[in-house]
Amino acid sequence: MRNKFKPFLIIATIALISATLGLSNVQAEDNPDMKGWEADSPYNQLYDVREYEKIRAWVVRVKEVVPMPGMSPATAIDVREGDEVFEVHLCPTWYRKPSEIRLKKGDRIKLKGAWAEVNGKEVFLASKVKQDPDTTIIKVRLTKDGTPFWTMPPEQLALELKAP
């Protein structure tokens, strides 16, 4: 009797998992907080790997900003490198709130990402932030092409978050 239902249970389980994963992707796309953060949005198209750079800087403050008119808010940090203070965009606040970023004024950090002009202002679009000595604080984009983590399917995101 048990073996008779085994194929049915396997198929039902696979269908349930597939439906759940598909639903989570639809929910992300329909999420009003996603406004301006979609994978193909004008904002995300500003990440240019040719502008990729590694920077060591000091945290000035963690804050919330609206990168472009009509977008939902972003978590950002102001950092100081030498005499220059500039803004670093991390991710949408619904993905990671400023209060969830374990950084404070005076922390020494390493940034990886790309420079971009956003709404008339030169900013750094981060892909990864590490705190000296090499403690990863947040990974938000693929370094190789700038794909935002918040646009990835759950299974791909899980793999990326496990990677060093």
Name each model-derived stretch:
Residues 2-12:
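Bacterial N-terminal signal peptides that target proteins for export
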Residues 11-20:
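Bacterial N-terminal signal peptides
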Residues 22-28:
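Sec/Tat signal peptide C-region and signal peptidase I cleavage site
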Residues 32-54:
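Short boundary/loop segments of OB/S1/cold-shock single-stranded nucleic-acid-binding domains
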Residues 51-71:
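Structural detector for short beta-strands of small beta-barrel domains
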Residues 68-90:
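OB-fold (S1/OB) nucleic-acid-binding surfaces
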